[in-house]
Amino acid sequence: MENDKGQLVELYVPRKCSATNRIIKAKDHSSVQINIAQVDEEGRAIPGEYVTYALSGYIRARGEADDSLNRLAQQDGLLKNVWSYSR
């Protein structure tokens, strides 16, 4: 779809699950998007700087959302030394 200026504008941009890389469908009403703010040395949120994770309803229904979020946050350097039974 194009707007009046001739620029390509999409009405729906599909998201991917951060944990499984599956496309989150438009009818997946149990999926969530979580934004975690970056903080400065004093512990205050930096405006406009955050890390976004999208979790599909499939992951949430299996009870894997908390483990997936911990794993993703560790990979991005937001968490360290989180216990996991798989280690």
Swiss-Prot record:
Subcellular localization(s) per the UniProt record: Cytoplasm
Keywords, comma-separated and alphabetical: Cytoplasm, Ribonucleoprotein, Ribosomal protein, rRNA processing
The keyword Cell wall biogenesis/degradation is annotated on this UniProt entry: no
User: Some GO term, biological process aspect, for this entry: which one?
Assistant: rRNA processing
Which InterPro entries has this protein been placed in? Answer: Ribosomal_eS21, Ribosomal_eS21_CS, Ribosomal_eS21_sf
GO MF, one term, reads:
structural constituent of ribosome
Q: Which GO terms describe its cellular component?
A: cytoplasm; ribonucleoprotein complex; ribosome
Q: Domain of life here? A: Eukaryota
The similarity comment for this entry is: Belongs to the eukaryotic ribosomal protein eS21 family.
Q: What does this protein do?
A: Required for the processing of the 20S rRNA-precursor to mature 18S rRNA in a late step of the maturation of 40S ribosomal subunits. Has a physiological role leading to 18S rRNA stability.
Assembly mode: Component of the small ribosomal subunit. Mature ribosomes consist of a small (40S) and a large (60S) subunit. The 40S subunit contains about 33 different proteins and 1 molecule of RNA (18S). The 60S subunit contains about 49 different proteins and 3 molecules of RNA (25S, 5.8S and 5S).
Give the protein name, as stated in the record: Small ribosomal subunit protein eS21
Biological classification of the source: Eukaryota, Fungi, Dikarya, Ascomycota, Saccharomycotina
